[in-house]
């Protein structure tokens, strides 16, 4: 598996924690920033490139972190083919993979701490899509997307 990871200025610390986790899990990743120091940056400038790498197949999944995770999630979901879910608990992280086959995880650094972020990311990275009735539902989303976006 190969993962693209990015954050804005509000998610740098958790981004670094998740990179350490992926090193431990021997998961290959591309760090797509931000290298923002103390400056403020705009989350869409990081969400769109990660989402584009996922839909192009260059990476399998993406992880996005901002202050709340909301802006990253909204931005990523504007890219056709993306199923980005915001998760701030382990139950949701697992369900987004098992039931929704999410290809991007969003988290908020101002909402959760680094320990919980690592747990969420580990579960999300190691959980597989269950298919079955959930595949039918994903298919309906994809059909709608093809017709309307």
Curated annotation (Swiss-Prot):
Species source reads Bacillus subtilis (strain 168)
Top-rank taxon of the source lineage equals Bacteria
Entry similarity comment:
Belongs to the LacAB/RpiB family.
Which keywords, in A-to-Z order, does the entry hold? Answer: Isomerase
A single Pfam family, by name? LacAB_rpiB
Q: Where is the active site?
A: 66 (proton acceptor), 99 (proton donor)
- Name the lineage: Bacteria, Bacillati, Bacillota, Bacilli, Bacillales
Q: What is this protein called?
A: Putative sugar phosphate isomerase YwlF
Gene Ontology terms describing biological process = D-allose catabolic process; pentose-phosphate shunt, non-oxidative branch
Q: Which Gene3D superfamilies match?
A: Sugar-phosphate isomerase, RpiB/LacA/LacB (3.40.1400.10)
Enumerate the residues binding substrate: 9, 67-72, 133
Q: Please state, per the UniProt record, what induces or represses the expression of this protein.
A: Negatively regulated by TnrA under nitrogen-limited conditions.
Q: Which GO terms describe its molecular function?
A: ribose-5-phosphate isomerase activity
**Membrane spanning segments where?**
none
Listed EC numbers: 5.3.1.-
Q: InterPro entries per the record?
A: RpiB, RpiB_LacA_LacB, RpiB_LacA_LacB_sf, SPI_LacAB/RpiB
Q: Which top EC class applies here?
A: isomerase
């Amino acid at each position: 598996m190969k993962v693209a990871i990015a954050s804005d200025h509000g998610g740098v610390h958790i981004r670094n924690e998740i990179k350490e986790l992926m090193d431990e899990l021997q998961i290959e990743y591309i760090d797509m920033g931000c290298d923002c120091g103390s400056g403020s940056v705009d989350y869409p400038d990081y969400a769109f490139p990660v989402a584009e790498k996922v839909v192009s197949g260059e990476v399998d999944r993406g992880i996005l972190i901002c202050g709340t995770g909301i802006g990253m999630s909204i931005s990523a979901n504007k890219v056709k083919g993306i199923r980005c879910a915001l998760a701030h608990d382990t139950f949701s992280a697992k369900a987004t993979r098992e039931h929704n086959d999410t290809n991007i995880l969003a988290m908020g650094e101002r909402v959760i701490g680094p320990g919980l972020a690592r747990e969420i990311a580990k579960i999300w990275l190691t959980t597989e899509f269950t298919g079955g009735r959930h595949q039918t539902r994903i298919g309906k989303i994809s059909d709608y997307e093809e017709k309307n976006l």
